[in-house]
Regions:
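Eukaryotic RNA-binding helical-repeat scaffolds
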Residues: 1-280
């Protein structure tokens, strides 16, 4: 017990010294430190509080990559009981000042964190930040998204699915993402796996009041791929649930748009049976 107490005192003293050094660190080092603390699951409250307060004190020094790292770390540190609200507010304000400096990958990362911080960021600030980052991401893409990484498209789609309020930029993304998927993602040998297609269709469904009806061609093409290549038993429960939601929405989309019912029903039945068997 004596050794345990000595070890605990040493750890507390060590983290106390580290916390005292935080204000002296340059922002890139601060951001890297936040990632390392998260990576090794260091939940020391004193150290995290120092990171929160220092980030809130000098947000104007943060560059896009620093912001991406810090947002990700603070979001994950919520599981330690960290309360990062002051840092999040200051960081979001900084994004609104420097969003044009973000590259495509950095926009994707920041969107992924901001969308998951509902309840910890003011809703109006959250919407403004996501709106600006989405606009910057769209402006960074090549014509027809020919060389846009598929994981970025999927990530942005998932991030936007919880936005709730559609805007002109969201509509631009929806149209471009569905066209991109038809051209590069869904065809046999395309950039998207069966699981990716489920995630994309689910995200499009969540952002579209009429579900998947407006994406009938993409639905038909995707269902063929999903039926042929999906390994439902390897998917998480969340993914299986999304797949069932997509299947239900696909039924309405194919029927309401006047697709050939016999072909559509055969395709849907071929997916529904194994999917529901695994989910149950």
């Amino acid at each position: 017990m004596c050794l345990f107490r000595q070890a605990r005192r040493f750890v507390l003293a060590f983290t106390g010294v580290m916390a005292a050094q935080v204000p002296k660190l340059e922002p890139p080092v601060l951001a890297e430190l936040s990632q390392e603390l998260q990576r090794f699951q260091v939940g020391d409250q004193q150290l995290w509080e120092a990171l929160v307060q220092d980030t809130a004190r000098r947000p104007q020094e943060l560059k896009p990559l620093d912001i991406v790292y810090l947002l990700d770390a603070f979001r994950r540190a919520l599981s330690f009981g960290v309360r990062p609200a002051p840092a999040l507010e200051a960081t979001c304000q900084r994004i609104m000042e420097c969003y044009q400096d973000f590259n495509s990958k950095q926009c994707t990362g920041a969107l992924g964190s901001v969308c998951r911080l509902s309840g910890h960021i003011d809703s109006s600030q959250q919407y403004k930040v996501m709106h600006l980052l989405l606009g910057q991401w769209l402006a960074s893409q090549p014509a027809k998204w020919e060389t846009t990484p598929s994981n970025q498209v999927i990530s942005v789609a998932v991030s936007l699915s919880g936005l709730g309020v559609l805007s002109d930029r969201t509509e631009t993304f929806l149209a471009a993402a569905s066209s991109w998927a038809l051209r590069w993602g869904a065809p046999e040998g395309g950039a998207l796996s069966a699981e990716d297609l489920v995630v994309l269709l689910w995200s499009l469904k969540e952002m579209t009041p009429l579900g998947l009806a407006r994406y009938r061609e993409l639905v038909q093409l995707s269902l063929v791929r999903i039926r042929a290549a999906a390994t439902y038993e390897d998917w998480t429960l969340v993914r299986q649930g999304q797949a069932l939601e997509v299947l239900l929405s696909a039924k309405h989309a194919l029927v309401e748009d006047g697709a050939d019912l016999a072909v559509a029903e055969e395709l849907l039945l071929g997916i529904e049976a194994p999917m529901t068997a695994v989910a149950s």
